[in-house]
Amino acid sequence: MPVLLDPENALALDVLLAGTDAQGLDWHLSAPDAADLPRIRGIGTLSSAGNEEISFLSNPRYQNQLATTRAAAVIVTPDVAQARQEQGASGHVLVVCKHPYLLYARLAQWFERASRPAGPAGVHPSAVVDPSAEIDADARVGAQCVIEAGARIGRGARLGPGCVIGAGSTVGADSLLHPRVTLYAGVHVGERAIIHSGAVLGADGFGFAPDPTLGRGAWGKIPQLGGVRVGNDVEIGANTTIDRGALDDTIVGDGVKLDNQIMVAHNVRIGAHTAIAACVGIAGSTTIGERCTIGGASMLSGHLAIADDVNISGGTAVTSNIAKAGRYTGVYPYAEHSEWQRNAAVIQQLALLRRRLRALERE
């Protein structure tokens, strides 16, 4: 169900926009003559929004829904607003903005804050807190949390039920850890981070050395002595794991966004404002630049260097360095099974076909 404010808390559209972080987005209102600005209780899609909700159009493929939406107001680009004016379309209050998706995001943030108050600060009686741990008076520690020796919880930080904060770990100001997040010892999370349930930061990296003294083919464990450092304004999805470094720390830069079920191995470094979709695996000691995007289920081999501003399509296997910004794709497209088998058989013979072609060219 969408978030709806109680009727008595509904806000006039202009008041709502002025109360969000929308001021820097250069928006203006376009309303039918003599129209009263609507009072807004929530936000929804064009197809589902009611007459007390605001909606948005950021993808042109949904433009036909403007004619049928029940939304009280719609966020659109200047081009869409001008086209509707030229067509004589009327009836909707428009919020005209060059970046409708971003304005929608700001409004969604406002509605989330309005509908989900943080609750009182303090430590739940069932939490277990080591005497040497430091918890800011404005922080909130939920039921069944465990805070180990020397850990520090910053101002305004919120820990959901069942979180574990290992020895010497830190959680920065205004960060939110959802229920059952685990930070092993020596993990440092910056300010305003959001970490979703089941995420584990600081487990041992996959480090083993062949050790014949233990038996034929046996492996000896390499203790992982580094930690994990997460920057400010980072979001980490549910059940994502970030391993501690072998000697140096594993680094997640400021503004990085990690989806659910991502594996970040030891000594990986992820540059600022990189976004990585679900089920990506990043092997050890790979460095990813700033402002990169990595599609879901991609796999990155270890000890690679990925440049800034690289976009990797979903499902791509990256096995060598990427030194130049741009888009990279390594996905073999799906097809009907019989067709795929025929194409795969040809691919296995490419070297032979190449030799035959060169022989023909020499004749």
Curated annotation (Swiss-Prot):
Keywords: Acyltransferase, Lipid A biosynthesis, Lipid biosynthesis, Lipid metabolism, Repeat, Transferase. Gene3D superfamilies: Hexapeptide repeat proteins, MurE/MurF, N-terminal domain. The active site is at H266 (proton acceptor). GO terms for cellular component: membrane. GO terms for molecular function: N-acyltransferase activity. InterPro entries: Hexapep, Hexapep_transf_CS, LpxD, Trimer_LpxA-like_sf, UDP_GlcNAc_AcTrfase_non-rep. This is UDP-3-O-acylglucosamine N-acyltransferase. The lineage of its organism: Bacteria, Pseudomonadati, Pseudomonadota, Betaproteobacteria, Burkholderiales.
